[in-house]
Amino acid sequence: MSKFADLLKSPEPVLVDFSAEWCGPCKQLKPILEQLKSKIGDSAKIIKIDVDKNRTLADKFQIRSVPTMILFKDGKSVWRQSGVIHASTLEGIIKQHSK
């Protein structure tokens, strides 16, 4: 978990997608995040966490539903949302916190 904590302290935004393999909306979100990753390049990191395999992290960040995305900047949570979101909206949120 210390590698994860170090990653969150990154000066560029880090989007963490808390999801599960059995989750339908998580499967809908996957291509959106892949598209976003190709658009934003190295300006932000996108990480997927399986809540069933990483229960400790899910509990630490109080994940009650999946998918839940949390955007971190300099180790702090700056945005959070549960559910599927449009790629352009998500891109705008990341760009807003990239400055």
Q: What do the PLM-derived regions correspond to, one by one?
A:
Residues 11-12, 18-22, 65:
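Short pre-active-site segment immediately N-terminal to redox-active cysteine/selenocysteine motifs
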Residues 1-13, 55:
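A short beta-strand-turn-helix
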Residues 62-70:
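Structural micro-motif
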Residues 15-16, 46, 69:
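Hydrophobic beta-strand anchors of alpha/beta hydrolase catalytic cores
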Residues 51-57:
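Structural microenvironment flanking redox-active thiols in thiol-disulfide oxidoreductases
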